[in-house]
Amino acid sequence: SINKKADIKAVTAFHPEGIGYNVVGMIKGTDATLAPEVIMAGGHLDHVGMMPVLMPGALDNGSGSVIIMGAAKALATSGYKPKRTLLFILYAGEETGLLGSQYFVDHPLVPLESIKALFNIDMLGTGYGIGANAAQKYENVLSYVKQANDTFVKRPFRTSLGANEIITRPRTDGAVFFQKGIPVISLHAFGATEKTPYHHPGDVIELINFEIMRDAVKLVSTTMMDMSEVSKVNL
């Protein structure tokens, strides 16, 4: 103790009229039997705004947003016709309490029971390796990611599989889907030589490794294609 007294004043503002939007894209499945089943990729589009200076959010989560859009564009423009439906979503309001992802599960565009897997991408834009957080019971879903990495991407890969049955931190979008019984694999990067400032003005594009983002697009695209084609997704 320094035996000192301090007075602290906080000035805050609440804007209940604020509106955010989820952004959704879909490639409809072509197989009469499998098309109702859905493979998803998602991540949050928002950052923390002005606090009071601009917070760029290049890694968190500009990186994940770009990867999802890249995978969606690659598959949509390739002429590929998936058997299962592929759904891509950018959530609003993750930083203010998972608002966008919670809205989606409360007002789903597809039946929640039809979603066979969600790949949640957050802060995958630095370092050299790709990490996957996965609950133990979703080892079969994780195997598609590992196969895509081993065959096409060939990045150092690690997973939390076997550590526990908690899919991810409860303050990330994947947790909202996990609580509904949907298999979730949360993808991120590891191995950065320089720590990227978290929720800080220093989270800028100059720190981003575009090579690993390119490989992440390839990983997500390939995994979704593979899962779309199998006769049955084993969970």
Locate predicted features.
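Structural recognition of the beta-strand scaffold that forms the well-ordered cores
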Residues: 23-26, 38-42, 87-90, 116-121, ...
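Short acidic/His/Gly/Ser-rich catalytic and metal-binding motifs that mark active-site loops
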Residues: 34, 47-52, 127-129, 193-198
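C-terminal soluble interaction/assembly domains
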Residues: 74-81, 112, 160, 178, ...
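Active-site alpha-helical elements of protease catalytic centers
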Residues: 58-71
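Soluble metallo-hydrolase cores and metallopeptidase-like ectodomains found primarily
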Residues: 1-57, 73, 77-83
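Second-shell loop/turn segments in exported
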Residues: 10-14, 52-61, 90, 128-138, ...
